[in-house]
């Protein structure tokens, strides 16, 4: 039995600060897996080639997960939730 969810056959783990962010928003690594599988790329800036930044829209909120490929596992380095507002021009 695996205690960590898997994405592309690699376990998903979290840094201490990302773990605190997940806890603050009452989310866990299974929510990160959902964002990675069903979300869309939403990188707002240039990232290293081994880093994935995916988002998923839930209601009027955007859930963002930033994970790094560390070879044998994925490491969550940031998790955040922010509001979504349509811009009017």
Question: Which role fits each region the language model picked out?
Answer:
Residues 1-89:
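Ribonuclease/tRNase effector modules and their secretory precursors
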């Amino acid at each position: 039995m695996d205690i960590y969810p898997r994405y592309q056959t690699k376990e998903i783990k979290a840094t201490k600060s990302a773990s605190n962010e997940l806890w603050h928003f009452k989310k866990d690594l299974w929510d990160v897996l959902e964002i990675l599988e069903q979300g869309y790329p939403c990188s707002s800036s240039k990232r290293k080639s081994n880093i994935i930044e995916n988002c998923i829209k839930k209601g009027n909120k955007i859930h963002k997960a930033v994970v790094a490929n560390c070879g044998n596992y994925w490491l969550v380095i940031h998790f955040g939730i922010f509001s979504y507002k349509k811009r009017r021009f």
